């Protein structure tokens, strides 16, 4: 089974994906590293620009029929049996990205993406089996246990559990000002 862990930068994808792979006894695959290994994409600054279709081809070729956990904000665009969309309060995302040294514009862009469900909508356009998990205020272990409970109970689709419009006023400073 290919499980894709996706979400806006700053939601905790890598930590959760590594722990989930460990608990399931699956191979952990960082899509950025995988693309670089395969010689696809181009590094521009801190970002890797890659053709999604080309990456998807290599993912399917390499992992079809195997048990892997894919980690990356493009993983929901890859062939997968189950997509887990991690969500986090936009303010939390802004704070984490600020700590990572993201520019104000990049912080605003990612806060906005989380606010309007960009990754979730893209995942639903590509896949039937999509589970949304709110990571806000939870430890990575709690998130992994929630995912495992959902998988073990046979749930393949759970969406619509996050609505950031209720906190929109609180998020406005983070949209284009990076929290300042």
Curated annotation (Swiss-Prot):
It comes from the Archaea. ATP binds at residues 10, 12-15, 100, 138. Coiled coil: none annotated. GO terms for molecular function: adenylate kinase activity; ATP binding; ATP hydrolysis activity. Pfam families: AAA_18 (PF13238). Residues 99-109 are annotated as: LID. The keyword Nucleotide-binding applies. Keywords: ATP-binding, Kinase, Nucleotide-binding, Ribosome biogenesis, rRNA processing, Transferase. Residues 30-50 are annotated as: NMP. The keyword Transferase applies. Broad-specificity nucleoside monophosphate (NMP) kinase that catalyzes the reversible transfer of the terminal phosphate group between nucleoside triphosphates and monophosphates. Also has ATPase activity. Involved in the late maturation steps of the 30S ribosomal particles, specifically 16S rRNA maturation. While NMP activity is not required for ribosome maturation, ATPase activity is. Associates transiently with small ribosomal subunit protein uS11. ATP hydrolysis breaks the interaction with uS11. Interacts with uS11. Not a structural component of 40S pre-ribosomes, but transiently interacts with them by binding to uS11. NCBIfam families: PRK03839.1. Belongs to the adenylate kinase family. AK6 subfamily. This is Putative adenylate kinase. It comes from Pyrococcus furiosus (strain ATCC 43587 / DSM 3638 / JCM 8422 / Vc1).
């Amino acid at each position: 089974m290919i499980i894709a862990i996706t979400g806006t930068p700053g939601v905790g994808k890598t930590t959760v994906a590594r722990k989930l792979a460990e608990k399931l006894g699956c191979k952990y695959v960082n899509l950025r590293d995988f693309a670089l290994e395969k010689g696809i994409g181009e590094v521009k600054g801190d970002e890797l620009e890659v053709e999604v279709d080309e990456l998807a081809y290599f993912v399917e070729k390499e992992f079809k029929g195997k048990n892997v956990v894919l980690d990356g904000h493009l993983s929901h665009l890859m062939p997968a049996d189950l997509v887990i969309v991690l969500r986090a309060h936009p303010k939390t995302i802004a704070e984490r990205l600020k700590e990572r040294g993201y520019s104000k514009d990049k912080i605003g862009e990612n806060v906005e993406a989380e606010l309007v469900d960009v990754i979730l909508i893209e995942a639903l356009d590509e896949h039937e089996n999509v589970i949304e998990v709110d990571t806000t205020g939870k430890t990575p272990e709690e998130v992994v246990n929630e995912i495992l409970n959902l998988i073990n109970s046979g749930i393949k689709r759970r969406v619509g559990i996050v609505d950031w419009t209720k906190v929109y006023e609180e998020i406005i400073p983070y949209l284009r000002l990076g929290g300042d």
